[in-house]
A protein has these predicted regions:
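Append "and occasionally in soluble cytosolic enzymes with long acidic Gly/Pro-rich linkers
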Residues: 235, 313-419, 507, 554
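Ligand-site clamp/hinge motif
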Residues: 236-283, 427-429, 434
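Ligand/substrate-recognition segments at binding pockets and active sites
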Residues: 227-229, 383-457, 498
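N-terminal lobe/hinge region of extracytoplasmic solute-binding protein
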Residues: 55-109, 142, 215-216
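Surface-exposed binding/hinge segments that line
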Residues: 47, 154-200
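Extracytoplasmic/peripheral linker and loop segments enriched in polar/acidic and small residues
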Residues: 9, 45, 423, 427-439, ...
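Long beta-strand-rich cores associated with HINT superfamily self-processing modules
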Residues: 35, 528-555
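Gly/Pro-rich hinge or "lid" segments in bacterial periplasmic/extracellular proteins
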Residues: 73, 80, 90-92, 188-245, ...
Length: 555
């Protein structure tokens, strides 16, 4: 999950089905035809050349997307152009290997364990000129359990028991049990040079100017990062062995959220993904050469708690905040004027989206109820003072919500929550911090009390259930450690039956509601504005994209 899924192996783990789903596509196609969100075109219909310009929220704090600081949506976007994503996902979430990277990805159940045979394409080449080999796979997994490596999450990766070298291109990966989401653990390949030691892994690409193309292998490479203009420029990778990209360059411009809509309207950027405000939607709709494409979104908005100290360490306080929080009002305000029914976007589940098998609304006992919130606080000994603010043992119930600068959605949510919590005797102040420091200095270091941000799901609903919630995860921003949560995370990861996994996930979600790790608010529908002539890219939904296929139709 990225600070960001349909499980394609949700209902079976038979060897036959595992192998069939992972069978290599003969023609190398990972798409399933045009959708409303992604109009397609054949290569011969597209221009050779052109630039695609994105807006992003901040420059990368770390170009290694596997690290805590690099595990953000903006870095993930860059990586989709320059780094190997060896699995393609179609619009229905089904996966097939990308033959530019892999010639085999097959799984079987052997002795109660999932065993996967992986063969890399002998043409695949790292940026340093070295060919891929099976050692890259083995060395990667050799370091997964090393705590000195700053992993964002090792969930799934840590289930690999051993990696055996079959030949120069082929490795056999054995998991410690039957593992339905095995392909998620093998969806990328990392050069062994980046895994050399913890310092290299953690720090060699820490900083906006410290990218290193030696560690990448994709249709594009990073040409530059202009610090003064805050622009990342990607160019065609001269070591790329696949089809020549149709685009010549891709640029990513660091912009405040508040500036994105106008930048798109002014034709300064070409992609406006996940439009989430009325003003921005109107700006995008007004651009004469553009259109807004729509699809099921993977992003979800939530309020996060730091429960490691202070009043929020009291579960009753967290529960009272849930009951005082009017999620429907927040969603309606955030999504006003957009072509979206806010009520239908409310999310009652942390793992499944409403369109996915396994979804059930587990929030029904935690709806907006001011009187219930007051009773929780009364029962926990928080007494209202003459100023209306509650206190206990001389400590006032005062909290600070930390939000990034120039983030209108977060500002709106903070203002609404401030009023809602005030009704039950909780004083909420708002602290706005520099967006570049928001995650590395505040959230990652648990230097906050409350916050709200967007996460992005993947095609695997249950692949990283412990990322925010397991006591050992570096991305557990709450500081909470609940044994029952850890037990369910472990069970979900080792249960082969899809229906049983879904049941366990919903049990876990109910435990998370009870303990209030966070508050899911709503799912963002994917509204993406792009030029009308752009093909093979748009509102992707569950589908991945091939960077080399993106282009503009010939005039």
């Amino acid at each position: 999950m990225k600070l960001n899924r349909r499980m394609f192996l949700a209902t079976t783990t038979s060897a036959a089905v595992l192998t069939a789903l992972a069978a290599c596509a003969k023609n190398g196609s990972g798409s399933s035809g045009s959708t409303a969100g992604v109009p397609t075109a054949a290569p011969e219909e597209l221009q050779d050349g052109g630039t695609l310009r994105f807006g992003i929220g901040s420059a990368p704090a770390n170009w290694n997307a596997a690290t805590v600081d690099g595990n953000v949506v903006d870095v993930s976007l860059v990586m989709k152009f320059v780094s190997p994503f060896v699995v393609d996902w179609a619009a229905d979430g089904k996966a097939t290997p990308n033959p530019d990277f892999l010639t085999k990805l097959e799984a079987a159940e052997v002795g109660g364990k999932t065993v996967v045979t992986v063969a890399v394409n002998e043409k695949a080449t790292w940026g340093n000129g070295r060919k891929w080999d099976s050692e890259d796979i083995k060395v990667f997994f050799d370091h997964v359990k090393d705590p000195s490596y700053s992993w964002a999450t090792v969930e799934g990766l840590d289930k690999v028991e051993k990696v055996e070298i079959v030949d120069k291109q082929t490795a056999k990966v054995t998991f410690n049990s039957v593992y339905p989401d095995w392909s998620n653990a093998l969806a990328g390949v990392t050069p062994r040079e980046l895994m050399a030691d913890a310092k290299t892994f953690n720090e060699s690409m820490a900083g906006a100017t410290k990218f290193n193309n030696d560690y990448f292998a994709g249709p594009f490479k990073i040409k530059s990062y202009d610090e003064s203009k805050q622009v990342i420029t990607l160019e065609r990778n001269d070591k790329w062995w696949g089809a020549t990209p149709k685009l010549e360059t891709v640029t990513l411009h660091v912009l405040d959220d508040s500036a994105l809509g106008q930048a798109f309207a002014n034709k300064e950027i070409d992609v406006l993904d996940y439009i989430f405000s009325a003003d921005v939607y109107q700006q995008a709709s007004g651009r004469d050469d553009a259109e807004v494409r729509q699809n099921t979104g993977l992003q979800w908005r939530h309020i996060m708690f730091n429960a490691s100290s202070g009043p929020l360490a009291d579960k009753a306080v967290r529960q009272a905040i849930v009951r005082a929080c009017d999620r429907e009002a927040i969603a309606a305000s955030d999504l006003a004027v957009l072509p979206v029914d806010a009520k239908k976007t409310l999310l009652g589940n942390r793992f499944f989206l409403p369109v996915q098998e396994g979804y059930q609304d587990n929030s029904t006992s935690w709806g907006h109820d001011v009187e219930a919130a007051k009773k929780l606080l009364d029962g926990a000994g928080w007494v209202a003072g003459s100023d209306g603010v509650r206190a206990k043992d001389g400590t006032k119930l005062e909290l600070v919500m930390t939000i990034p600068s120039n983030a209108p959605v977060a500002t709106n949510e903070a203002n609404l929550l401030q009023k809602q919590l005030g009704e039950v005797g909780i004083k909420l102040s708002v602290s706005t911090v520099e967006i570049d420091k928001y995650f590395p200095e505040y959230i990652n270091k648990k230097n906050y009390a409350l916050t709200a941000f967007t996460s992005e799901k993947t095609q695997y609903p249950l692949a990283n259930v412990g990322q925010y919630y397991a006591s050992t995860s570096q991305s557990n921003y709450t500081g909470l450690s609940v044994p029952e949560v850890d037990q369910h995370v472990a069970k979900i990861g080792s249960t082969p039956d899809g229906a049983e996994r879904n049941k366990l996930a919903n049990e876990l979600d109910k435990i998370l509601w009870e303990n209030v790790f966070n508050i899911p608010i709503y799912q963002r529908m994917q509204l993406t504005a792009v030029p009308k002539t752009l093909r093979n890219f748009g509102a992707q939904g569950l589908a991945s994209f091939r960077p080399e296929r993106i282009g503009y139709v010939k005039s």
